[in-house]
């Protein structure tokens, strides 16, 4: 028998749920669900808008992953990328196969074109937003909180850009959110499988697994010690039995699927050899001081070292003289300022709120932030690991949740909430990649 998960724990505390209400999705009865559908539709339309532009250009790391997919499919590819790679096998051994395989599958169906490259990212970006809304609604029992958090996430630039380019990160995030939602729904073993799929897209999915493990133990501890059931003993044998089952499903499914994909599409006969290669490759990615687009993790909280993914400049001439240059397209790896500059204060407030009233969703926000972001600090300080700002993508939803809690917990006038939402839209518009109609 499985433990109740986020949903059951929230009900046990009597704070995060209103007698089971708000768990479903019914736009006909819940106006917040209806408003979310509008936000979702706008987000989807913006991801699809000019998806094939700029023509003939690969954006940022698409140079690698699109060409990897071409190699997997046996198609002609850029000779600068894995020039000696045998066709039919994934030459990009530093990451697991799954996300690259999904890109290749899309290209097999839709063709070697921008729609084939990017449609899976559009799907997973949209899926991530929908799962995030359902997750927040389920763990908090509050549709207004879920709507505001989803609005903030939808109009974050980093989330938007990675939800429409053929890179691995949004696949990892999508499966991670699926794992969180399944856990919150009480389907724990399916949650472990989803988090294994997240890790098989990119190793950062491991942080999502850590979030669930730590949350499960801490929430049981607080329910027993401070959630209205003072004196209740913690059932440690049951907790460790749950940990054993959850970990076995996560590890076994991950290793078995890795072995299958490695044998069919990568060229490894032993998944542990592949895991050893990934470990050695990652360990070697070091530099004493960051260079170029590399950055320290603490710089991400200030949106520093933004990454120019792709810029198309327009030159203006007058009488054969260059008088002005401006970007017509500028894809940038950076967060919406209205999100990132509130990250630290909102997470601190969420931690304070949990200390005060033990709401489960505030604990999740804090752990989500801490376990997907803070591990980069020792990696940077002690290991001199090379890092990039877009590693923060897994943490962006946690910040959106924390900001929404910070705002709504003050019970401000609606005009204040509206003003913040307008400011988020202004920040999104300011960073929107297409500066003019292509």
Annotated model-derived regions:
Residues 48-52, 63-101, 105:
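Extracytosolic helix-loop segments that constitute the early lumenal/periplasmic catalytic or substrate-binding loops
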Residues 53-79, 251-305:
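Aromatic-rich transmembrane-lumenal/periplasmic boundary elements in polytopic membrane proteins
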Residues 59, 121, 158-169:
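Short acidic/glycine- and proline-prone juxtamembrane loop motifs at membrane-interface regions
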